[in-house]
Amino acid sequence: AYEIRPRDWSSDVCSSDLLNRVVSLFRQRGFAIDSLAIGRTHEAHISRITIVVDGSKTGVEQVVKQLYKIIEIRKVSDITDDQRVERELALVKVTSKSATSRAEIMQIVDIYRARVVDVALGSLTVEVTGPTDKIDSVVGLLRGYGIKEMVRTGVVAVTRGAGVAADSSKLHVVA
């Protein structure tokens, strides 16, 4: 029996144009990508791709072997079982037609330590950052007011402590 649960991958690559090849490897093997984020790192010309996928550990290990065959990929870390810090960002434009609804939305913003980044006639744009479950909770509460527009970044993660994911000889995947 295989354990099926979300897996978080962190891959440092030499150029962000590798995204298509990396995603294709997961897609070809039938993995559903729950979250994907790519961005620059502290090293010039290096980007990090963080992918959360649903799949068995065995299946994911097969993808890792294939990822290492892509010459531009420097390292792949499966940090599922490691202590880690994960964050996601969402921008949510919410309908706000009355002073009462604005006050209620502001209460939600305060409780979840989110912030309003834009105010317009009839709407507020809320920025919320944190773990995925926090984002889901805020979005769930704001749905009652009418979401006009929303965008989420996808999960980014780093391991806790002084080390980095690639320092260990074991394979790391985040769940």
Could you describe each region identified by the protein language model?
Residues R102-E127:
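Strongly charged, low-complexity linkers/loops
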Residues L36, I71-R84, A114-A120, G146-R160:
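Conserved short beta-strand edge segments in small beta-sheet-based binding/regulatory domains
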Residues V22-F26, Q62-I70, E104-D110, V138-G144:
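Short amphipathic alpha-helices in soluble, non-transmembrane regions
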Residues I33-S56, I79-E86:
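Short, charge-patterned binding micro-sites
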Residues A1-W9, V13:
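Single conserved hydrophobic/aromatic residue that forms the stacking wall/gate
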Residues S10-L18, K93-T100:
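Short, surface-exposed ligand-recognition loops at beta-strand->loop->(often short) alpha-helix junctions
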Residues G55-T100:
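Helix-adjacent hinge/juxtasegments
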Residues V85-I108, T129-R143, R160-A175:
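Short, low-order "capping/linker" segments at domain edges
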